[in-house]
Regions:
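Predominantly flavin-linked oxidoreductase catalytic cores and closely associated redox partners
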Residues: 2-137, 194
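Secondary-structure boundary elements
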Residues: 8-17, 42-44, 141-146, 199-208
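Short, solvent-exposed loop/turn elements at beta->coil junctions and helix N-caps
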Residues: 24-25, 154-159
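Short, conserved secondary-structure transition motifs
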Residues: 82-87, 157-161, 215-218
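Conserved FAD/dinucleotide-binding core of flavoprotein oxidoreductases
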Residues: 101-155, 175-188, 203, 207
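Single, function-defining residue in the core of a domain
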Residues: 133-136, 161-166
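Residue-level marker for buried hydrophobic side chains located in beta-strands
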Residues: 169-171
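Active-site-proximal substrate-binding core of FAD-dependent oxidoreductases
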Residues: 183, 196-218
Length: 218
């Protein structure tokens, strides 16, 4: 909803074009990404911002930037997430996120206005997905949705790319990296990365030092 609000009330009124198409090819040249090819058109730009999530289509899949895994110290790499109803909204609607340790990981509980966002984080090295789902449902009790299709299984790539701005590609958020803590760092990292990118783009010319500094700062 936050992203939808930003699009409708901030980006579009300022002239940002929202194009919904699937990228089918990403040719490269000496500057990095040459263009983004869809089924109907090829889009050319001076700078490409990779915001493709864990897929990291531009930085990782296209430019092959090395990825430094942190799974040796942060083993959690999977999660089940679901939208759960309130049992007693008046008493359950809290202004904070609650985290609870259970058998093989921890559960986040984020009270929203009309529902609760909740999920179970674990490592698939120690427990399989189906067993983890059963543990999660047991923890939720009567709040647990009955249909498995209501649950989303997420595979997390824990670590960060060696460089976050390579040639004409700058990675933002999960496409840059992810560190699984006791609270998702997604929104914070997106905000900070964009702020740093804007500061660099205000310069008369972006140098390799600026690109390296973007990686160091972020």
């Amino acid at each position: 909803k936050f992203g939808q609000w930003l699009k409708e009330h901030y980006c579009l009124p300022k002239g940002v074009k929202h194009i919904q198409e699937d990228i089918v090819d990403v040719p490269t040249n000496e500057n990095g990404v040459k263009c983004l090819v869809t089924k109907t058109y090829s889009y050319y730009a001076d700078l490409y911002i990779d915001c493709t999530g864990f897929k990291s289509l531009l930085l990782d899949k296209t430019l092959n930037e090395p990825f430094e895994s942190l799974t040796d110290t942060l083993p959690n790499n999977s999660a089940w997430a679901v939208r759960a109803p309130y049992r007693d909204r008046e008493n359950e609607l809290k202004p904070y996120t609650n985290c609870t340790a259970i058998e093989n990981g921890w559960v986040w509980n984020i009270p929203l206005w009309n529902r609760v966002g909740t999920g179970y984080v674990y490592s698939d090295k120690f427990i399989d997905d189906e067993t983890a789902l059963k543990e999660f449902q047991k923890h939720l009790g009567s709040r647990a949705p009955k249909n498995k299709s209501d649950y989303k299984n997420i595979k997390m790539r824990v670590g960060i790319h060696k460089r976050l701005w390579v040639k004409n590609v700058a990675a933002i958020g999960l496409s840059a990296g992810f560190i699984e803590p006791l609270e998702s760092n997604g929104l914070f990292s997106v905000h900070e990365f964009l702020g740093e990118l804007i500061r660099n783009l205000k310069r008369e010319k972006v140098s390799q030092f600026d690109r390296d500094n973007f990686t160091f700062t972020c």
